[in-house]
């Protein structure tokens, strides 16, 4: 569907879309991007986000661990939210809702699955080290089962703006049908069809 150059462009646009939303989400005090790709550094800087470089792409769990270390040691964060950059329907209202769900809890996770319930499209952890992350296979169920096993309150947040991601060409085809979405990434996909 997309050649390598188009995929790089789409990835950059998805990151731009995500950072534009997160930069206006009132409860967030810091947005952190972890990547080995220097283009991500430029985009993060443009949106006032902190960029943490990886020496090489080591997977999502490694990137989250790097960000967790920074958040705990440098920011003294009492909670973190992990959000992938492939959510073109993302809005700041749902981020506020996730924070509200955790606000009165001393320990919890707030979690939103992917539309297929096999991935985790948003994971708020309070405190950040309350559970590790399992962004490999069936991450949504792994996160929920781990939290339950440890006696940590699980607060599901089911939101269309979080559940729909772009993991497959079929996902992209479904998402371009959405109306009133200002995501540059979706406009780019539409232009390539």
Q: What do these predicted ranges mean?
A:
Residues 138, 144-193:
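Conserved alpha/beta core of the MobA/IspD/sugar-nucleotide pyrophosphorylase nucleotidyltransferase superfamily
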């Amino acid at each position: 569907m997309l050649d390598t150059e188009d995929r790089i462009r789409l990835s950059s646009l998805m990151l731009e879309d995500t950072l534009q939303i997160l930069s206006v989400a009132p409860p967030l005090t810091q947005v952190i991007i972890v990547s080995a790709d220097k283009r991500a550094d430029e985009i993060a800087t443009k949106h006032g986000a902190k960029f943490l470089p990886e020496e090489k792409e080591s997977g999502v769990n490694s990137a989250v661990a790097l960000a967790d270390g920074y958040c705990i040691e440098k920011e003294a964060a009492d909670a973190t939210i992990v959000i992938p950059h492939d959510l073109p329907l993302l809005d700041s209202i749902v981020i506020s809702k996730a924070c509200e769900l955790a606000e009165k809890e001393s320990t919890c996770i707030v979690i939103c699955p992917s539309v297929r319930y096999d991935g985790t499209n948003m994971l708020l952890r309070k405190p950040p080290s309350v559970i590790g992350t399992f962004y490999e296979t069936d991450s949504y169920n792994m996160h929920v089962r781990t939290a339950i096993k440890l006696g940590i309150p699980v607060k599901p947040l089911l939101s269309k703006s979080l559940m729909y991601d772009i993991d497959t060409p079929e996902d992209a085809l479904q998402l371009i049908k959405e109306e009133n979405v200002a995501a540059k990434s979706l406009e780019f996909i539409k232009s390539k069809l």
